[in-house]
Amino acid sequence: RGAMGYVLCGALSSSGMFAFLSASPYVYIEYFKVPTEHYGWLFGLNILLMMVVTFANSRLVKGVGAERMLQYGLTVLPLAGALLIYNAWSQTGGLWGIVIPVVLFVGHISLVGANAMTGLMGHFPQSAGTASALAGTLRFGIGAVVGILVNLNPPESPLPMAIAIAACGLGSALSYWLLTGKRARVA
């Protein structure tokens, strides 16, 4: 049960990124009329924050531990998801009202994934390769399903993407807090 909490935590956080990857070209290029040659710059903001967060995690995890870093990431994901839904629903902030919470969400996926994998490995020290392979397979499998679901109906606004990303962030946090037996704690 605890191991499944870590697996689902990592898989659902990654699935939020799959929702973004599937829907963002429509949202940015079609809905907000971003020129196609500028899409890469907006996409790159996600990678930039992901690099910064990954670097910070590599330094901070030694002092505060993987669980605390994971709990921090699992606080950011649902909050970014909630802000994303609010901005998409209320049309607050225009393009940047969508880009900023998406960057916050996607930028923290590597932190959640790495620290969730650390927690999972603690459950399977003798079969870490098998556990890691299963977790990776589920990340891509669930992500593919989420990517398909977010695009089943042609979107008319950023809201379907926002709902999918937020649901993945909340699901990731709930999987951890309900299945691992760890107490919820804001980092």
Where are these regions (language model features)?
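Small-residue hotspots at the loop-to-helix junctions and early N-terminal turns
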Residues: 36-44, 132-133, 162
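Helix-to-loop junctions at the C-terminal end of transmembrane segments
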Residues: 53-67
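Multi-pass alpha-helical transporter architecture, strongest
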Residues: 167-187
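C-terminal transmembrane helical hairpin of 12-TM major facilitator-type secondary transporters
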Residues: 68-115
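A late C-terminal transmembrane helix in Major Facilitator Superfamily
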Residues: 117-156, 164-165
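Pair of pore-lining "gating" transmembrane helices in MFS-fold secondary transporters
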Residues: 2-19, 103-107
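Transmembrane alpha-helical segments of major facilitator superfamily
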Residues: 42-50, 139
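Short amphipathic helix-loop junctions that connect adjacent transmembrane helices
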Residues: 22-37
